[in-house]
């Protein structure tokens, strides 16, 4: 999205705007800029693991995965690890209050993935999330379709959810419908629990 807005130009933008493009608009270029800024992908991987999130591996950037799609397999996680990372961010004060508010607002303003998890939730339910997906291999396999976020329940509680679809031969429409269906089932179960 940033390259579309500023084609073939030298630009100067704030880190705040770079973060907004990365979080709210899923911009791969700004994601890689941020990775470089904090010391590289190995540093990001080490930091997340230092938080106690162990079932993940990050060795590739967006650029390296676009150069060779098979490198996408080097980056992996479990849905539980992604959801636990979100839970830690929201409950353990990993970020300063100012940075947490910024992150939460950026996730609530996410413009991508309107047909993913959020599509399975009632329109009046707040949902902050971050989406992603890989390219397809030459065999038509979508290595990853992802959405992870926070459902704000009517009673004030939060539900942390992550859905990662791996090696799918399904159409993009079917993949996102699976995600929406999962979100609907989770919300229905949570709502039932609130009324029992």
Protein language model features and the residues they cover:
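Active-site-proximal loop and beta-strand segments within enzyme catalytic domains
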Residues: 1-16
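Secretory-pathway/luminal and periplasmic proteins that interact with or process carbohydrate-rich
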Residues: 1-4, 28-31, 55-59, 112-117
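Structured, acidic catalytic/metal-binding patches in enzyme active sites
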Residues: 10, 25-26
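Mid-domain, small-residue-enriched loop/turn segments at the edges of structured enzyme/sensor domains
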Residues: 11, 19, 32-94
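Catalytic-loop motifs flanking and including active-site residues across diverse enzymes
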Residues: 18, 26, 30, 78-81, ...
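Structured C-terminal helix/loop/strand segments within mature extracytoplasmic catalytic/sensor domains
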Residues: 36-37, 41, 84-116, 120-125, ...
